[in-house]
Amino acid sequence: MAVQKSKVTRSRRGQRRSHDALTGPTLSVDKTTGELHRRHHVSADGFYRGRQVITPKGE
């Protein structure tokens, strides 16, 4: 069993946990359609940075 050498204070425990918070996805507005999409990701209709890079499966 792992046993700590000394007690971890509330302050040190909080400092360690300070980087654990979750952040929401960063969203941008598509130039061509005006839809929201995740930054640096291809949108649902296949556009990336204003030009079509893939054709969607539905077409």
Curated annotation (Swiss-Prot):
Note the superkingdom of the native organism.
Bacteria
Ranges of Basic residues composition bias in the record: 7-16
Task: Write one Gene Ontology MF term.
Answer: structural constituent of ribosome
GO cellular component, as recorded: large ribosomal subunit
Please give the InterPro entries that the UniProt record associates with this protein: Ribosomal_bL32 (IPR002677), Ribosomal_bL32_bact (IPR044957), Ribosomal_zn-bd (IPR011332)
Q: Name one GO biological process term.
A: translation
Question: Pfam family of this protein, just one?
Answer: Ribosomal_L32p
Query: Which SUPFAM superfamilies does the record cross-reference, listed alphabetically?
Result: Zn-binding ribosomal proteins (SSF57829)
Q: Does the keyword Amino-acid biosynthesis apply?
A: no
Q: Where is this region: Disordered?
A: 1-34
UniProt keywords, alphabetically: Ribonucleoprotein, Ribosomal protein
Instruction: Please verify whether the record's keywords include DNA-binding.
Output: no
Q: Which family does it belong to?
A: Belongs to the bacterial ribosomal protein bL32 family.
Q: What is this protein called?
A: Large ribosomal subunit protein bL32
UniProt source species: Marinomonas sp. (strain MWYL1)
Q: What is the lineage of its organism?
A: Bacteria, Pseudomonadati, Pseudomonadota, Gammaproteobacteria, Oceanospirillales
Q: Which gene encodes it?
A: rpmF
